[in-house]
Amino acid sequence: HNRIDFEDVLLGMLGMLEAEKRVLDQVRAQYSVFVVDEYQDVSPVQQKLLEMWVGPREDIVVVGDASQTIYTFAGASSSYLLDFPNRYPGAHVIKLETNYRSGEHIVTAANHVMAGRPGALTLVSSNRDATPLRRHVALDDAAEARYVAGTAAELIASGVSPDDIAVLMRFGAQSLLLENALRDQGVSHRVQGAAAFFDEPHVKRAVMEIRGAAVAGVQGELLPVVQDILFGLGLGAEAPEHQGAERARYEDLVALQELAAQAAPGVTLLEFSTMLQRRMETGDNPSVGAVTLSTVHAAKGQEWPVVFMIGLAEGQFPISYAKTEDAIDEERRLFYVGITRARERLFLSYAQKNREGQQPREPSRFLRALGEGAEKP
């Protein structure tokens, strides 16, 4: 279909460097030092390409964490990271064992999970004043969703920003019950990877109206002008009482209003409308304060002060089709990535039965590795 993906680009580049010495020499002459981040996630093709770029030199720096190798299904292998000192005997190895993100209890849990695994470090937290982990056992999936939603609502009521809360899960379908429970509690949320903000019809219309006003030469301070346009499209002074499409529409219009409020002094309506169109094209989505729902894979590289990890039962995490030792180890690393997304508070939960209440479940082996202390239903 005359289309190529990222892997095709890598293969094409590798083939060109192998076939065209002139191009290879130019690349090696152009770049003197190579720095590779997330080195535990490189694939064989990427490793071969890196070796072609570097050549016989040793001017290379790699950064990685073998405990965060969670893309083996895409060809990633931590072996390149672990074997690096053997391939470069003169390499200076710096172990980054101080964790500046997570509290002491979270780091201790992470160490328990990865103890004895290849390349695992024994981390030390720089934050000694940390809240203990909270573990909860729910009767069924619906009860687990209600627990998470209720606890999130309590945290928000106590002053925690919704943007500082994330709920992480092994697979996306686990969010369905949770979304309903959050709506029942009146808690705004965003599903990471869901439909883009600027794809919403009411947002497209609002951007079009703002652009039209700018082209027509409407004068005045930016925020009042934008507010007038948004009020004309249904933005009220008060949020709708109930969750649903009307509330979602209101929050999207508020997000546009917030963009106008955050604009630098002196920004014109035309400049603002141009910025909106640029963000629409690039998919840079604003949002009002909302709890993030995400799979652990999608959450990698991010962090939140408060993290809930749900579905921590055998067959869910580790997932049911993880049968081999290597597959279980990948699930273990994924669990490690999940718990280390939390900075201050970490909530771990599972349900004893499924939604229909028919299939009993056992707690995840990863949860059991952390010891006792779960709250009972």
Go through each PLM region and give its residues.
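Conserved helicase NTPase motor core
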Residues: 1-83, 98-102
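Helical mechanochemical/support elements of P-loop NTPase systems and associated helical scaffolds
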Residues: 5, 13, 59, 77-80, ...
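P-loop NTPase Walker
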Residues: 25, 108-111, 340
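Short glycine-/polar-rich loops that comprise or flank the Walker A/P-loop
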Residues: 56-59, 65-67, 88-92, 129-133, ...
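A short beta-strand-to-loop transition that corresponds to the Sensor-1 phosphate-sensing loop
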Residues: 64-67, 74-76, 98-100, 110-111, ...
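Helicase P-loop NTPase motor core
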Residues: 89-92, 97-187, 212-213, 245-250, ...
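Conserved helicase C-terminal RecA-like lobe
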Residues: 175, 179-181, 185, 200-374
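A short glycine-rich beta-strand->turn/loop micro-motif centered on a GG-aromatic cluster
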Residues: 189-201
